[in-house]
Each structure stands twice: as structure tokens, then as C-alpha cells.
Amino acid sequence: MKGWLFLVIAIVGEVIATSALKSSEGFTKLAPSAVVIIGYGIAFYFLSLVLKSIPVGVAYAVWSGLGVVIITAIAWLLHGQKLDAWGFVGMGLIVSGVVVLNLLSKASAH
């Protein structure tokens, strides 16, 4: 259970860091650049803890899949990124894949 909590923390850290990348303007703005560095540091530290209890393939699939969906949603909602019906279908498939991997696949057993 602790592994999944750590994975959520890793995903949140990665999402915050990636969201701040645009504001850092190529690491020329100090505050957003610090958020990027700290966020990625938190993300990778907690991902390393996750790997003690969750298989790397499962952890990385959940981390990257949900990260992509959340980042895309943030860009769509806050930054006006265009997202058509196929974009929503693709994100739905990513989430579906993560659910299948975790609920139905034996790969998630440790």
C-alpha cells in the first residue's frame, strides 16, 4: 500500500515539475526553474522507493501513463492546448491500459 502512495507522490512531483517547465523559459526564470528541479527530484526519489514494492514495468507504466494524461489535461484546461476527439480517445486508451495492467494482468503481482 505504501508503494502506491509513493507512486502518487512521484506522479504529483513529476506533473508539477513538467507543468513548470514552460514557465521556466528554458531555465532562465529562477522560481519556475527551482520548481522543476525540486519536482523532478521528488518524483525520482519517490519512484525509487516505489520500486521496492511494485515491479518496475507496472510502476513506470502507471507513472508515465497517468503523467501524460494529467499533463495533457492541465495544458488543455489552463494553457489552451487544442485537444480533439482523438486526443480524448487516446487518453482514454492510456488510462484503460493502466487499469488493465493493474487489475487484470499478472505482471502487477510482486
UniProtKB/Swiss-Prot annotation:
It is found in: Cell membrane. The lineage of its organism: Bacteria, Pseudomonadati, Pseudomonadota, Gammaproteobacteria, Enterobacterales. It comes from Escherichia coli. Gene3D superfamilies: 1.10.3730.20. It is a multi-pass membrane protein. InterPro entries: Small_drug/metabolite_transptr, Small_multidrug_res. Belongs to the drug/metabolite transporter (DMT) superfamily. Small multidrug resistance (SMR) (TC 2.A.7.1) family. Keywords: Cell membrane, Membrane, Plasmid, Transmembrane, Transmembrane helix, Transport. The keyword Hydrolase does not apply. The chain crosses the membrane at residues 1-21, 30-50, 58-78, 85-105. GO terms for molecular function: transmembrane transporter activity. One of its GO terms (cellular component) is plasma membrane. This is Quaternary ammonium compound-resistance protein QacE. The gene is qacE. Multidrug exporter. Is implicated for the resistance to bacteriocidal quaternary ammonium compounds.
